Curated annotation (Swiss-Prot):
Entry's family note: Belongs to the class-II pyridoxal-phosphate-dependent aminotransferase family.
InterPro entries the record matches: Aminotrans_II_pyridoxalP_BS (IPR001917), Aminotransferase_I/II_large (IPR004839), ArAT (IPR024892), HisP_aminotrans (IPR005861), HistidinolP_aminotransfase (IPR050106), PyrdxlP-dep_Trfase (IPR015424), PyrdxlP-dep_Trfase_major (IPR015421), PyrdxlP-dep_Trfase_small (IPR015422)
Name this polypeptide is given: Aromatic amino acid aminotransferase
BP-aspect Gene Ontology terms: L-histidine biosynthetic process
Reaction catalysed by this enzyme: an aromatic L-alpha-amino acid + 2-oxoglutarate = an aromatic oxo-acid + L-glutamate
Residues modified as N6-(pyridoxal phosphate)lysine: K219
GO MF assignments: aromatic-amino-acid transaminase activity; histidinol-phosphate transaminase activity; pyridoxal phosphate binding
Assigned EC number: 2.6.1.57
Subunit structure: Homodimer.
Gene3D superfamilies: Aspartate Aminotransferase, domain 1, Type I PLP-dependent aspartate aminotransferase-like (Major domain)
Length: 358
């Protein structure tokens, strides 16, 4: 007798990461081109010496460091094996049957529909607005008696667009208090909206028990290979997250690197500013070439190429630069270092390429 596997799993698509190819420039996975901060690299080496010991299952030291950094209590912070693991755990603690609905904009983070179906819940996708941003009014209007969870990816992956604080607060005011709203801020460190409008989810959600904020050390901090992210929210939600947390899933090296990165965060601004300079240079060059490129608050830009997306991705790969096509929606291009960006522009801004794909 063969094992009885859930039949619905056969319809779940595998998560598709950005491609890798030796010798090619990889602008497909939103990774930083720089290694971890020096203090983090040192902490990684030291922590590796203790790899024969189990890590702190509660990530107590890291939670305390984050609580101090964010101005919250330790009880408001949970740690996960990357913020995507926390996304799945949030579905687990809110949804218990296929009648339960998880709302999110589309297109948005590719993992949302996957983890929703894995969690045996129903995904409800709300189309983006014409400017490739979350349609917050439509998202609020899509809430039903079955809605349990809403993911708001801000800035949005893969389109790079972001809503300011005022728009987010209006949206949150429209959502029933029993529906959990997740502000997924994986690219928070790259946002450069005005100080008055910059949507710090921790501040926005400070007096809203139904708001949880997710951030990660994978992007700006350069720890993508170590898998460590965190959630900030009401103690009741955090307690539930820690109940479904897979024991020891945040390893010792990841915890040490994250703590060291926080302690050296003053070094991060120079790195993120360099990315932003290149982001704007890349976008301006693509606009000048004739492409439609929405403003980005992330470490990538979005080319809404529609049906040409896959073909553009293959042509770029043939030119030695890997980018990330998304079906028939568009192509996401990570901001690399100046040399890598120039290689991509030599391909994309070529008049023959523009005429073919624009």
């Amino acid at each position: 007798m063969s094992a009885r596997i859930r039949p619905d799993l056969s319809s779940i698509p595998a998560y598709t990461p950005g491609r890798s190819n030796p010798g090619a420039v990889k602008l497909a996975s939103n990774e930083t081109t720089l290694p971890p901060l020096p203090a983090a690299a040192k902490a990684i080496a030291e922590a590796a010496e203790l790899a024969h010991r189990y890590p702190d299952n509660q990530s107590g030291e890291l939670r305390a460091a984050l609580a101090e950094f964010l101005g919250v209590r330790v009880e408001n912070v949970a740690i996960g094996c990357g913020s995507v693991a926390l996304c799945q755990e949030l579905v687990q603690i809110t949804c218990s049957s296929p009648r339960d609905e998880v709302l999110f904009a589309w297109r948005s983070f590719e993992a949302y529909p996957i983890i929703t179906q894995v969690g045996n819940a129903t995904a409800v996708q709300v189309p983006l607005s014409p400017d490739y941003a979350h349609d917050l009014d439509a998202l609020a209007a899509a809430v039903t008696e079955h809605t349990r969870l809403i993911f708001v990816c801000n800035p949005n992956n893969p389109t790079g667009t972001a809503h300011g604080r005022a728009a987010l607060e209006r949206f949150l005011d429209a959502v029933p208090a029993h529906v959990l709203v997740v502000l997924d801020e994986a690219y928070y460190e790259y946002m450069r909206l005005t100080p008055q409008d910059r949507p710090d989810g921790v501040e926005v959600g400070r007096n809203r028990p139904n708001v949880v904020v997710l951030r990660t050390f994978s992007k700006a901090y350069g720890l993508a290979g170590l898998r460590v992210g965190y959630a900030v929210g009401d103690p009741e939600v955090i307690t539930a997250l820690m109940k479904v947390h897979i024991p020891f899933s945040v390893n010792r090296v990841a915890q040490a690197a994250a703590i060291a990165s926080l302690e050296a965060r003053h070094e991060l601004l120079e790195r993120t500013e360099a990315v932003i300079v290149e982001r704007e240079r890349l976008r301006e060059a693509l606009l000048a070439a004739g492409y439609d490129v929405p403003p980005s608050e992330t470490n990538f830009v979005w080319l809404p190429l529609g049906a040409h997306s896959a073909e553009f991705g293959e042509a770029s790969a043939a030119a030695g630069v890997l980018v990330r096509p998304y079906g028939t929606d568009g192509v996401r291009v990570t901001v690399g270092d100046p040399h890598e960006n120039e290689m991509f522009l030599r391909f994309a801004a070529d008049p023959a390429v523009v005429a073919r794909f624009r």
